[in-house]
Every structure is written in structure tokens, then in C-alpha cells.
Amino acid sequence: MNLSYLVACGLMITLLSVRMGAKPLSQAQQKSFRSLLGEELAEFLESEEKERRLDAVRSRLRLLRDLRMDTRARGVWARLLNDQPVPRRHKTGIKKGGSSRSGCFGHKMDRIGTISGMGC
């Protein structure tokens, strides 16, 4: 039973690994093919060649765009991982007195810190 599964999997892998590809026509074959098909189909074949070229240009543009996006992502990571301290802006205003309202370093304590008394 297991042997049949193993053989079936091996056969599937073998079939998947075989590539089905078309070989390009030589110049002589293309000329004879165009003479048989006529001008209309010859133009169609030429348009396919143009389409292939256009696809190649599109793929190059896609690669350049991906490269640009990759450098942007690197820049974001570099900014995030930068070790330089960022200057902090402190709010300037009237501070209300009272030790119950302020916790560590003059900042307002959160609810858990105020209730439990575990704050600074």
C-alpha cells in the first residue's frame, strides 16, 4: 500500500519536473511558414513578437520598481534601527500640583500604578 503511494508520488514528481517547451523556428522555417499562412497571419506573428518585446520591457520596469521599493524599505529599517536618540518635545504648560496625580518623573501614572501603589 505504501509502495503504491511512493510510486505515485515519484511519478507525479517526474511528470512535474519534465518541461514542455517550444523550440523557436529557424529563419528558413519562418519564411516558408509565412508564405503558407499569408500576410494576415504573418502580421499576427509579428505582433506576437512585439508583444514579447513589450513584455520584456514591462518585466524590466517591474524589476526596477521592485528595486526602488526595496531601497525604500531598507531606508525605513535604517531609520527604525538608528541608534541616535530622538530629541523629545516636552509639553510646556501649567502643571497641577499634588503627588497623587503625578507618578514617575512628573508624568501622570496609569490606572494600575495608582491603584496598586506599585508605581515610583
From Swiss-Prot:
A single Gene Ontology CC term: extracellular region
The keyword Signal is assigned to this record: yes
Biological-process GO terms, alphabetical: blood vessel diameter maintenance; cGMP biosynthetic process; receptor guanylyl cyclase signaling pathway
GO molecular-function terms, A-Z: hormone activity
Keywords: Cleavage on pair of basic residues, Disulfide bond, Hormone, Secreted, Signal, Vasoactive
Signal peptide: 1-22
Subcellular location: Secreted
SS bond partners: 104-120
Statement: the UniProt record of this protein carries the keyword Glycosyltransferase: no
Xref: InterPro entries: C_natriurtcpep, Natr_peptide, Natr_peptide_CS
Propeptide: 23-96
Family: Belongs to the natriuretic peptide family.
Function recorded in the entry: Exhibits natriuretic and vasodepressant activity. Has cGMP-stimulating activity. May help to regulate body fluid homeostasis in a variety of aquatic environments.
Protein name from the UniProt record: C-type natriuretic peptide 4
Source species of the chain: Takifugu rubripes
